[in-house]
Amino acid sequence: MNMIGRAVLVAALALGLLGCEKTKTDNNKTGTPSPVIAKADQYAIDVLGTYYLWNDEIKKDLVRLSPDTCRMPMEVVKSIRYHEGGKEVDKWTMLTDDLLSFKKSIQGQGLTYGYDLQLGKFSDRAGEYFLVVSYVCKDGPAMNAGLKRGDVIITLDGKPITKDNVYNAFNTYSVALGVTNVEGDHISGKVRTVRLKAVDMYEDPILVTETFEFGGRKVGYLVYNGFDLKSSEVLPEVFKEFKSKNIDELIIDLRYNGGGYAFTENILASMIAPQTNVLAGDVFQTEVYNSILADVWKQQGED
């Protein structure tokens, strides 16, 4: 599954610095980077040059991370990660100065408003955008404030949404949302203010589990938003419930799933894979390495 491969790349290669000193952008605009920044530069070069899947493709850009000159390694890593033309293929590899928060984030834990939003652009308002609520997390600030799927947000802190403030909907400790509804093809003129305060919470990726009848058949429906480790312990119970209800069909909705651990993916697959494929030993998952690691694999084998 492609999404797993992408997410594992993040988990394995997110360039979290060793040690306790944070690697902040060097405010010195001239001269050489500070020792901590220089260490981050070299670490990024070593990891990207050796372990990164597209190491050959970005090799020429690693010079931008020179410990002698690079004062913004986090920004440079983000800018040089693999593109195909103007398309950003790798959206996940990152250098971070907050490894604890990163580890929490890949476990679904972090400071959040407890919602997922999709961005849209007004056709008749130059430079202005709107946000549509895709879903809200159980017991999160958004749900507790009455937000629901389909709500439309047209202002942030009383101002129209633009490229300059759109991230306030995610990256602030509090926000005032101007929320409206869609009536037909038009946004309703009625706007209500919803105030949210971010909380540190676990966003359960098992968003919906239900059973319904369709065409004379019983269907199990699971909305699953991330292959984290914690949810791997709950998935077997979900499928036991489906089995107890004698479902005929199963829908697993992964539209908002950003990836996660292959371990959890394998648990899910073990509960739904057709027996014929299992007995035939069909390939379910493959791992792809760059040329350096592929050569090591060939020489040393799985051990």
Label each residue range with its predicted role.
Residues M3-G5, L9-K39:
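Bacterial Sec-dependent N-terminal signal peptides
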Residues V36-F130, V179-V208:
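Extended, small/polar residue-biased N-terminal targeting/export presequences
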Residues D46-L53, K138, V152-G158, K240-S244, ...:
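Sec-exported extracytoplasmic/periplasmic mature domains
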Residues Y51, K121-S123, D139-P141, K159-I161, ...:
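Solvent-exposed loop/turn segments at secondary-structure junctions
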Residues G108-T155, K159-T162, Y221, D228-S232:
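PDZ/PDZ-like domain segments forming the peptide/carboxylate-binding groove
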Residues L131, R149-D151, V191, R217-G220, ...:
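Loop/turn elements at helix/coil->beta-strand transitions in domains of secreted/extracellular proteins
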Residues D157, T162-I247:
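C-terminal, low-ordered peptide segments at domain boundaries
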Residues G259-D303:
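Gly/Ser/Thr-rich loop/hinge elements
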